[in-house]
């Protein structure tokens, strides 16, 4: 099977399995384009994106433009003359001048069943909204936000207790598999691009810290979904005696009481009332402390039954 000349564009860990799949297939990777190194941690040390580290480990040239719309960058890609550009969670909108360069087009791997959940955080919002199924779509890119013609789709169920960390890893692998299948299908002429139905679309906007603020005046299931969907970042949080308390793992229960009230804090269990039902908090973290299971947390930080969690600062609904 003849290889294609490809420029790969991606940034986070999610994109790494797809890049690795291209390497393993023997595709001719002319360059990898990724976001600039960013300061991280308390020391604000510049850290390379995961995709950059993988590319350098395989001696693939790396480009890190601050703006992909810059004419100098577009010209550098034109000089490489790729047959195809593959994009996975790159992080910038590509201009038409760049999209027009490869004769075979630009193929994007998007982590949703398009046209639903276009945008920056599809997996998180799928979970937050209580979806029971999601998937991956490959598409030919146009100048819109995830609006191009679809190539292939692969669906997968979401368990009611699965969080974003688990789903992210599964979908990253699924995306790599689907991209390989897509490239084979395009090479063999087996794929007919399908237009998206815009009337069925919805958007998954970039996450903000305020999306993590818990409003206990909501049903337990909705708060549970919020915890699952934000477990990686920013974390769902409330207040305990004025201190930020992040929740990482919960289960829905059928307790009743005033929303935000601690119903049970004995036997290693921490149960909090919601508008409809209650939550069993199984893993949590107080500001400045370690992330712990509920039994370990309560052993070091007892919470009296009847304690009210939250307050004016946290009682804001998720948009």
Curated annotation (Swiss-Prot):
It holds the Pfam family Formyl_trans_C. CDD domains: FMT_core_Met-tRNA-FMT_N (cd08646), Met_tRNA_FMT_C (cd08704). GO terms for molecular function: methionyl-tRNA formyltransferase activity. Gene3D superfamilies: Formyl transferase, C-terminal domain, Formyl transferase, N-terminal domain. Its EC number is 2.1.2.9. InterPro entries: Fmt, Formyl_trans_C, Formyl_trans_C_sf, Formyl_transf_N, Formyl_transf_N_sf, Formyl_transferase-like_C_sf, Met-tRNA-FMT_C, Met-tRNA-FMT_N. Keywords: Protein biosynthesis, Transferase. It catalyses: L-methionyl-tRNA(fMet) + (6R)-10-formyltetrahydrofolate = N-formyl-L-methionyl-tRNA(fMet) + (6S)-5,6,7,8-tetrahydrofolate + H(+). It comes from the Bacteria. (6S)-5,6,7,8-tetrahydrofolate binds at residues 112-115. One of its GO terms (cellular component) is cytosol. Belongs to the Fmt family. Attaches a formyl group to the free amino group of methionyl-tRNA(fMet). The formyl group appears to play a dual role in the initiator identity of N-formylmethionyl-tRNA by promoting its recognition by IF2 and preventing the misappropriation of this tRNA by the elongation apparatus. This is Methionyl-tRNA formyltransferase. It comes from Pelobacter propionicus (strain DSM 2379 / NBRC 103807 / OttBd1).
């Amino acid at each position: 099977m003849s290889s294609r000349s490809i420029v790969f564009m991606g940034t986070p860990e999610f994109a790494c399995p797809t890049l690795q799949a291209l390497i393993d297939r023997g595709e001719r990777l002319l360059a990898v384009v990724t976001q600039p190194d960013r300061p991280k941690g308390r020391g604000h040390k510049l850290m390379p994106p995961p995709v950059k580290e993988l590319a350098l480990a395989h001696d693939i040239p790396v480009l890190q433009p601050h703006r992909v719309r810059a004419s100098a960058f577009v010209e550098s890609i034109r000089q490489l003359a790729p047959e195809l550009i593959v994009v996975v969670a790159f992080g910038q909108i590509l201009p038409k001048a760049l999209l027009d360069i490869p004769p075979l087009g630009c193929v994007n791997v998007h982590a949703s069943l398009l046209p639903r959940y276009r945008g920056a955080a599809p997996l998180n919002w799928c979970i937050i909204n209580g979806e029971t199924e999601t998937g991956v779509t490959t598409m030919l890119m146009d100048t819109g936000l995830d609006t191009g013609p679809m190539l292939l789709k692969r669906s997968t169920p979401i368990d009611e207790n699965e969080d974003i960390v688990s789903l992210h890893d599964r979908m990253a692998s699924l995306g790599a598999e689907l991209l390989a299948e897509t490239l084979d299908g395009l090479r063999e002429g087996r794929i007919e691009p399908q237009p998206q139905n815009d009337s069925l679309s919805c958007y998954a906007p970039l996450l903000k810290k305020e999306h993590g603020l818990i409003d206990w005046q909501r049903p337990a299931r909705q708060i549970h979904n919020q915890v699952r969907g934000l477990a990686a970042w920013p974390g769902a949080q409330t207040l305990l005696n004025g201190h930020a308390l992040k929740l990482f793992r919960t289960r829905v229960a059928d307790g009743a009481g005033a929303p935000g009230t601690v119903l049970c804090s004995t036997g290693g269990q921490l149960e909090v009332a919601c508008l409809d039902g209650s939550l069993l908090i199984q893993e949590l973290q107080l500001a400045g402390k370690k992330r712990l299971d509920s039994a370990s947390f309560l052993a070091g930080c007892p919470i009296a039954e009847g304690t009210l969690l939250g307050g004016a600062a946290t009682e804001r609904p998720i948009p």
